[in-house]
Amino acid sequence: MLLTQSYFCIMSMLGTLARLGLTALNTYPGAPFSGLLWVQFVGCVIMGFCQTESVFFPRPKHNATFLLAITTGFCGSLTTFSSWMLQMFTGMANLDPFERRGRGYSFLSVVSDFMVTMCIAMSSLIWGKQIGKTTGQWRIGKVAFAWPIPAHTHIVVRVLLLLLSICFFVGAAFYTAYTTNVTHRGIGFSLIFSPFAALTRLYLARFLNSPQYFIPYGTLCANVFATLLLSIMYMIPQITHCTPVSRSVMYGIQNGFCAVLSTLSTFSNELHTMPIKRAYIYCIISVAISFSICVIVDGATAWGHGYTEKY
């Protein structure tokens, strides 16, 4: 159990850093699409790769903890369902007073965002599965470029991983407490909240994602609750004045807790492995409930009260 938690602590923080970095790197004036799309693409490719790879993990049952940390921990923290829902809402809401558009374009914005993201997620997942099947051919002559990872973790390695996860977490906490850079403080809070969100998602999946259930209720609950909390955290600084520290905390909750608690890579993998009828029902329920939450929480505030503060 401690080994699993150590893996998840490290992987969730690395996934959060990778998501923030990829999003920032691909967010620039004139970008052809949102930086969040690259995050979903990379996470789903890695998720698909780990599903079919047989050289690095020749005995999946013995490497189950490490595989779980990569797929559920890293990929689940890298991709995000709640931020996608909020992005769909902000694209539809038409809140920019200087670039008003017709209601029909708002509808097209929602449809476009949904279709493009789902197509990228599913196709990249399948592509990752195809790449995973080729690892046995990663060689030039007799030189192989893929080696099996040890199936059993030595007790010394387990202790080192536990200490590393503690040091990583404590280091992020101390840096967040003493830094004066607002951006760094927000990223620090994101790192602090991410392990708690990843472990919450893990235990929700263990208790509520039984094959006996019609749909994976654990992933559904994680995605819906994360979307609800993200909508609230996005709305608060838009309607009331917040101190720089409180804004950093809310930024950390949005990008550390909510974005990590929700996941698109696991969601896409579940859709790919489920029977077609159940997959469509699961997808419709997840998107409809989550997007409705964004509309109710943020839409009612934006169109009724109005956003008076610049976030």
Swiss-Prot record:
Task: Offer an example of a GO molecular function term for this protein.
Answer: fluoride transmembrane transporter activity
Q: What are the entry keywords?
A: Cell membrane, Glycoprotein, Ion channel, Ion transport, Membrane, Transmembrane, Transmembrane helix, Transport
Does Cytoplasm appear among the keywords?
no
Show the catalytic activity: fluoride(in) = fluoride(out)
According to its UniProt entry, the protein's GO biological process terms are: cellular detoxification of fluoride; fluoride export across plasma membrane; fluoride transmembrane transport
* Glycosylation-annotated residues: 181
Query: What PANTHER family is this protein classified in?
Result: FLUORIDE EXPORT PROTEIN 1-RELATED
What name is this protein filed under?
Answer: Fluoride export protein 1
